[in-house]
Regions:
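Formylglycine-dependent sulfatase
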Residues: 1-407
């Protein structure tokens, strides 16, 4: 009876808030948005919550994050493009002191605040500054300060304001972020169970590089062998069947710079790129499942508002061989060698199968064209392919209208 009474009491309190963001994930990359990729945990939230068909971001990593956290146009925050200094006004590339974050506001109103994931709101990534998460309202932080990096040996991995403990042999960033987020919920429940919390969980997945454990990649072997043309058609039909788009909406033409699948010579390598990307998305979903399990275990699930979105559409960037060979010191994205001393093969090379720590590749325009089905263009562009994102909201005791919201 005590546990039932405790759960009932908690249900009447202010809701906890968990805000989850994917990185460079396309509109149709979740199962509940028509994908072949397995995302059971997000699909479950969508089934019991609300999915939006017309939710938008700002088409780039940093501006989307700045707007999400402040409620402002990105230029007002100082993040007009990315985190390099492009001049005065809205382009200094660092979140300024003329805005407040949702963490600062909620913290002032009695919420515990925590962040686990990718920050990417300042170019000063190696030394703490007033633009770091711990100085913008988050009481605790674990993640990367920069905008990208290895999933096995992430550069700028930070706990609080100090370099985090070195990754062990089993380290995989997406999974670790899920564990760290669940750990925050567990520790908070023990320390201050009556206090609501705000947890910001911006994953780096599935942003390049294409990194995923081989055992997960293998589970997608053959799934993408029919190629991007056929798979775009299938996703388009599933989006119609799911009532996310109108059946009068045609599928956009294949990008003019993408060759027909029937003309592709290196199909095995191309399929491998998408297999790895799919593994990254599924592992993010699994990490979200870890967080959901902890919410249920602590009795907080029903009174937690969970929101999920992506920062922009699928990314068409092709990483040329040697693209990051000219590294700053200290490096921003990746180290030249793995922890075992193996040289990292940087760039998209059809002789190198992506996935392992000694690779650094992207899935490129052909597969981004699939990710953004049914739309044109990609991250960077303000066409629908760049700015349309899945959005899922779930709050069992809140007054959310379930189903698909087209408004």
């Amino acid at each position: 009876m005590n546990s039932v009474s405790s759960a009932s009491t908690r249900s009447r309190r202010r809701p906890n808030v968990v805000l989850i963001m994917a990185d460079d994930m396309g509109y149709s990359d979740l199962g509940c948005y028509g994908s072949e990729i397995r995302t059971p945990h997000l699909d479950g939230l969508a089934a019991d919550g609300v999915r939006m068909s017309q939710f938008y971001n700002t088409a780039r990593c940093s501006p989307a994050r700045a707007s999400l956290l402040t409620g402002l146009h990105p230029h007002q925050t100082g993040i007009g493009v990315l985190t390099h200094d492009d001049g005065p006004g809205g382009y200094p590339g660092t979140i300024n002191d003329r805005c407040v974050t949702i963490a600062e506001v909620l913290g002032d109103h009695g919420y515990a605040t925590a962040m686990r994931g990718k920050w990417h709101l300042t170019g000063r990534v190696h030394e703490p500054s007033d633009a770091w998460p711990t100085r913008r309202g988050f009481e605790s932080f674990y993640g990367i300060v920069a905008g990208a990096g290895s999933y096995y040996q992430p550069v700028t991995l930070t706990r609080g304001e100090e370099p985090a403990e070195p990754p062990d042999d089993d380290f995989y960033l997406t999974s670790r972020l899920g564990d760290e987020a669940a750990g925050f919920i567990r520790d908070h429940d023990l320390a201050d169970p009556d206090k609501p919390f705000f947890l910001y969980l911006p994953f780096t997945a599935p942003h390049w590089p294409l990194h995923a454990p081989e055992e997960m990649i293998k589970t997608y072997r053959g799934v993408f062998d029919d190629g991007w043309d056929e798979l775009r058609e299938r996703r388009h039909q599933r989006l119609i069947d799911l009532e996310l788009i109108n059946d009068k909406w045609p599928l956009s033409e294949r990008d003019s710079e993408v060759v027909a699948w029937d003309e592709v010579a290196d199909r095995d390598w191309q399929a491998r790129r998408m297999e790895t990307y799919a593994a990254q998305v599924e592992l993010m979903d699994a990490a979200i499942g870890t967080v959901l399990d902890e919410l249920r275990r602590t009795g907080r699930f029903d009174n937690t508002l969970i929101m999920f979105l992506s920062d922009n559409g699928g990314c068409a960037e092709e990483i040329p061989p040697g693209w990051v060979d000219e590294l700053p010191n200290p490096p921003l994205h990746t180290r030249p060698r793995t922890s075992t001393g193996e040289r990292v093969r940087r760039g998209n090379d059809s002789t190198v199968r992506p996935g392992g720590p000694a690779t650094y590749a992207s899935y490129g325009k052909p597969w981004a064209n699939l990710s953004n089905t049914p739309f044109r263009e990609y991250k960077h562009w303000v066409h629908e392919g760049g700015i349309a994102t899945p959005f899922i909201a779930h709050w069992p005791i809140g007054e959310l209208r379930s189903g698909v919201d087209h408004d």
